[in-house]
């Protein structure tokens, strides 16, 4: 019997989960710093799409390189799975992060992180419908508590007025994140999860780059500091 992966060891789950949460929290200020580093204005939609595309294309290639070094299988079943992988990249990366970058750049960081968390609650509910997963009292209570927090934040006196360019884009991002989460379950049943993630990031980034150029983005000198 083969040795279990460290990722399957329950003792390490809190560490990995905490690291993932911390990394995701850092995304909000780092995106703002990156946009500022490249001089991308708040109204420059094309520039934001180009910036996001460059970052995700680079991230996807790095993930695929790691997968190769780890000896992961790159086999992609023919037929429907390949189209599902393309849809995965379009929804989970291209559309999700197009809306996400627009929203984050036009919304306060703390508020953006709270609105973005809506995707998690939507995914729990959607998975119960699509995959017939049982909703426990704990998960229902968690969703209600989370939704209540989002509503209170947006109704609070310090929240400011709802904006389509900020809050609206983040809500669209959350819906795409929910759809991407469902597609993740479908695609990773038929191919390696790490390889699927790498393909999704690279493909989504490759779609965002020409989209940004078509929207009038003007490429500037690439700086690794800004991309990171």
What is the predicted function of each stretch?
Residues 34, 51, 103, 108, ...:
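Hydrophobic/aromatic residues within transmembrane alpha-helices
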Residues 63, 125-126, 135-156, 174-175, ...:
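Hydrophobic transmembrane alpha-helices of multi-pass small-molecule transport proteins
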Residues 37-94, 122, 126, 176-183, ...:
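Transmembrane alpha-helices of multi-pass small-molecule transport proteins
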Residues 13, 17-18, 79-87, 135-147, ...:
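Cytoplasmic-side transmembrane-helix entry/capping segments in multi-pass membrane proteins
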Residues 38-50, 98-116, 192-194:
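Structural motif at transmembrane-helix junctions in multi-pass transporters
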Residues 1-53, 159-186, 206-210:
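Glycine-/small-residue-enriched transmembrane alpha-helix faces in small-molecule transporters
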Residues 23, 64, 68-112, 116, ...:
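Specific transmembrane alpha-helical segments of multi-pass solute transporters/efflux pumps
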């Amino acid at each position: 019997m083969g040795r279990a992966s460290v990722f399957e060891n329950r003792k390490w789950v809190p560490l990995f989960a905490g690291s993932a949460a911390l990394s995701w929290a850092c995304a909000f200020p780092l995106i703002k710093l990156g946009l500022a580093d490249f001089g991308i204005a708040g109204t420059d939609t094309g520039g934001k799409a180009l910036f996001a595309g460059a970052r995700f294309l680079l991230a996807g290639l790095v993930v695929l390189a790691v997968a190769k070094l780890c000896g992961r299988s790159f086999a992609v079943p023919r037929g429907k799975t390949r189209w599902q992988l393309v849809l995965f990249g379009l929804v989970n990366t291209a559309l999700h992060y197009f809306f996400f970058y627009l929203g984050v750049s036009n919304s306060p960081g703390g508020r953006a992180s709270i609105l973005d968390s809506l995707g998690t609650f939507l995914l729990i509910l959607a998975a119960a419908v699509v995959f017939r997963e049982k909703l426990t009292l704990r998960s229902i209570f968690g969703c209600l508590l989370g939704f209540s927090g989002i509503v209170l934040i947006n109704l609070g006196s310090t929240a400011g007025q709802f904006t389509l360019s900020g809050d609206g884009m983040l809500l669209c991002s959350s819906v795409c994140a929910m759809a991407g989460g469902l597609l993740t379950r479908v695609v990773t049943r038929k191919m390696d999860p790490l390889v699927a993630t790498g393909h999704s990031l690279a493909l989504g980034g490759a779609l965002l780059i020409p989209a940004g150029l078509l929207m009038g983005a003007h490429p500037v000198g690439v700086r690794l500091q800004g991309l990171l």
